[in-house]
Amino acid sequence: MADFQKQKVQWFPGHMAKTRRQIKEMLPLVDGVVELLDARVPYSSANPELDSLVRGKPRIMLLNKCDVADPAATKRWIAAFAAQGKTALAVDCRSGKGLSAFLPTVQQVLKKTIEKNTQRGMAGKPLRLMVVGIPNTGKSSFINRMAGKNRAKVADKAGVTRQNQWFAVGGGIELLDTPGVLWPKFDDPEVGDRLAFIGSVKDEVTDLETLTCRLLEVLGRTRPQAIIQRYGIEVDEYMQGWEILEAIGRKRGFLMRGGEIDYNRSAVIVADEFRGGKLGRMTLELPE
């Protein structure tokens, strides 16, 4: 476990390359794009290939899971995006928090499209939006919340595969669901780590013990009080991740035969509790 710093996170299965091609092919069918980001890592969860893929389509960014992110940091991110001319909303798609602003925002961002439709005698034409994002950012939760329990699939459009379905969500809006897609290589290893921390990279393709040690080392430097309050152990900024994980395992009684720490069980618990917000509301990166 001592060499955990040397391992890098990478994950780009073949189906993601296919999804990327499908997104490009389906863009002519939509009026705009809704991008789901994780509010805890807005930079790392933004696919850097999207700007070139969407080719200038109007875009709305949803900073999802804002309920487990630092609210002050989320405000800073929204302001930073606004300074770049991008529209961003803080939402929690599971509870519906913040989504009341979505329809009015669509009307505002797609104002020119609506006016153009009216001039062409197509007033009331449904606005079609493609929903994109990396895995585990909440695209399905967003569509389920917007469409309701009895969500109605719109008839398949030309060029749309069975994995990419349209849903009518009211307000004259149709959403096109797409599978989560990453990009081929994380140039910054910290981006790969953060995506693995939040579960956007499958645990099966990482060493969860190694990953959790990295997470605990980050939190030990930046949010030691969160670890202290949750696990009742002493932490300082000089402790290595494996030392913190060991202390947590011992405190929780995760022991194997002979009194050895069960590192895997400890890692699973810490990762799950971090992702579920049980260590408190926190954001792992801030805008420059």
What is each model feature region?
Residues T113-N117, N144, N150-D156, T222-I227:
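Short, structured loop/turn "capping" segments at alpha-beta junctions
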Residues E35, M61-L63, V131:
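Structural beta-sheet core signal
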Residues R128-G148, A152, T178:
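Glycine-rich phosphate-binding P-loop
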Residues M1-V33, R40-E49, L53-R59, C66, ...:
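Helix-rich effector regions associated with P-loop NTPase G domains
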Residues D67-V132, R151, F254, I261:
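Canonical P-loop GTPase G-domain recognition
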Residues K97-L99, I134, K139, V160, ...:
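Gly/Ser/Thr-rich helix-start
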